[in-house]
Amino acid sequence: MKSNSQNYFYSGPVTSKKFGKALGKLTLKIDKKAEQVEFELLDCFNQSIRKAGCVLLRLHNTLTLLLPSGQIITQICPEPLSYITLLSEGPIKKALSYVSPLRSLMVVSKGVCKQLTVSLLDNEQKTQSRAHLRTFTSSAIPTTLTLASLVYLRGYPNAHESLSKKLDDMGFNIMENPNVIYEKLIADYSVYEPKPKITIGNNATAYDTANSIIRTYLKVAQANEFGVIADIDSEFLHDYRVSLRKIRSVISLFKGVYSAEQRSTLKTLFSDLMAPTGRLRDLDVYLLEREMYFTLLPTSLHQGLEYMFKLFEAERNDQHKALTKHFKSASLNKQMRTVEKLFFGDNPPKAGASATMNASEYATGVIWKCYRKVCAIARGIDENTPDDEVHELRIQCKKLRYLIEFFSTLFDKKDIGTVIKSLKVLQNTLGLFNDYSVQQDALKEFIDARTLSNTKQNIAIAQSVGALIAILHQRQLVERSKVVAKFVNFDNADTQTKFKTLFKR
């Protein structure tokens, strides 16, 4: 065992009797803390804390964070915590700064915890080594796990090594990563991946690959349904929609893989699944941009924004109720059964003329074609180009990105990473251009959809929204002016060569 601060685990309970009374010439002192307390294991749905090698626990009114280094830090948190950004300033908030502000914490396991501290004392009663033990018993599954955090006290390496060896002799193992805690304390533990890697075999056909991609993202969409219904955070609906959008891209871009009739049926089917989610997502985006909107306008116009966001919040509540009802409806259940029969049953989609093409051959052809289309549109854009063509460039870039990601495992990881990175830079500018455009249209519709009488509230809303539209328009123009420069950067000789090498046949 390593002679430094380290976390260990043991499958089962550990009592003070198992330690005995001494280690060599040093006395073992057992300090039992208060009676058992309730614990909660916290993480976001995307398990960003686990993926960082950490474990976040709530014991009574204290947050405890186990770091990959073996260090343990704590922070008082008297109230239940949803978002890390809402936590008061302190060591845990700082350590978890990587957690997305859009992701809410969830209780992924809970139960009771017994705590005790084991200290090694010399004949002068000085502590030479210490271990904090926490025994967790899950309330969901019949399992118990004990974590031991061995604290290295400077100047006493021998005592530390002795206590480390004692833990080893008792059956403790070094906790290399937090997965063991998740596996032991969570019923039906599984790892969520919003962008799962899809392995494509050397002999796989275009048809096999299309079906595999659709099956994969269907599972991602279905994994997010409960979070949409429970309204845990806005990312559940976002990931649900992105998954369906990727499926629709497969159906649209994989021409010839499915029969014309089947392709048309699939387009309608997935369009119908997507449609009911649109308005709620729009409202989520507006509410997430709330702070930005207030920053853009002087305080004299903030009252109108307050009124507007109250209306958005009320509409969002109505939209969420409607979508929840839809998710639980017989009609959606019927739609999903139809989809599952096609992609998980014995009656797969009808194949088209290109279905039997080798996946690699098909991939290079469709990616190269999409890349050339992106270049053709972008090279024709200047200051007089209509906005619709700039929007079309954004759509084609997104299609190109999806295609490259779908087939990424067929190509060198480093080369694909370089291509995607250069494409992202262009997409970011196009995305901002689109966001400002969409927001202007939405705000105009918001005003036009209401017959505003000359009340104080309606006048304030009209003034604020009018000013906001003007500012967003200016920002859109700025981003539009960057598009040509960003494309020139994307369309450099190195990127052209990379695309030709990877995809031109």
How does the language model describe each region?
Residues M1-R505:
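Function-determining surface determinants
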